[in-house]
């Protein structure tokens, strides 16, 4: 008898915003719900007080201070670094964290299944290498 294991990858989308609720955020909120993904939005001091999501989890500036992370208490206001609070929240319950911005509109295939299995190249050279950040699959060797 052979055992078969099925792993369900839990996904979450994390964004930060200082803006009012816009169509992009509404789309992420609705479509995340449809595909059973979590949606986490991290607000800031400038985020409107009446900001609310229908399905996702919104953390206001004040909500973040109540979290059990030291970073959430020391992270400066009005900083993109606050997105890290969303990552900390998401690491607890999710396998895949998808990062995007509130001004990006999700393309049609954005919500298709994701995998953590990727084709890679084996590095034979034992010398120092540099991975090019603009193309993570291209590797250049340094001699």
Language-model segments: what does each one mean?
Residues 10-11, 31-41, 57, 95:
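Short loop->beta transition adjacent to catalytic acidic/histidine clusters or analogous donor-positioning motifs
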Residues 94-107:
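Short beta-strand-to-loop acidic/aromatic patch adjacent to the donor-nucleotide binding site
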Residues 66-70, 107-143:
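Conserved catalytic core of nucleotide-sugar-dependent glycosyltransferases
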Residues 18-20, 42-48, 64:
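Short, polar loop motifs at secondary-structure junctions
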Residues 40, 57-59, 98, 137, ...:
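Hydrophobic/aromatic beta-strand patches that form the interior of the parallel beta-sheet core
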Residues 44, 61-64, 100-103:
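Short loop/turn segments at strand-loop or loop-helix junctions that form parts
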Residues 3-35:
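N-proximal low-complexity "stem/linker" segments adjacent to membrane-targeting elements
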Residues 49-92, 111:
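Active-site-proximal specificity loops/subdomain of glycosyltransferases
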């Amino acid at each position: 008898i052979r055992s078969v294991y099925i792993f369900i990858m839990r996904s979450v989308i994390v964004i930060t915003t200082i803006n009012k609720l816009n169509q992009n955020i509404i789309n992420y909120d609705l479509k995340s719900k449809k595909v059973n993904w979590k949606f986490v939005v991290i607000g800031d001091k400038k985020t409107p007080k009446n900001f609310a999501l229908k399905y996702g989890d919104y953390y206001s500036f004040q909500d973040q201070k109540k979290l059990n992370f030291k970073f959430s208490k020391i992270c400066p206001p009005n900083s993109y670094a606050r997105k890290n609070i969303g990552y900390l929240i998401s690491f607890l319950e999710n396998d895949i964290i998808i990062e995007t911005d509130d001004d990006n509109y999700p393309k049609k295939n954005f919500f298709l299944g994701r995998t953590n299995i990727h084709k890679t190249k084996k590095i034979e050279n034992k010398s120092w290498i540099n991975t090019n950040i603009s193309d993570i699959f291209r590797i250049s060797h340094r001699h």
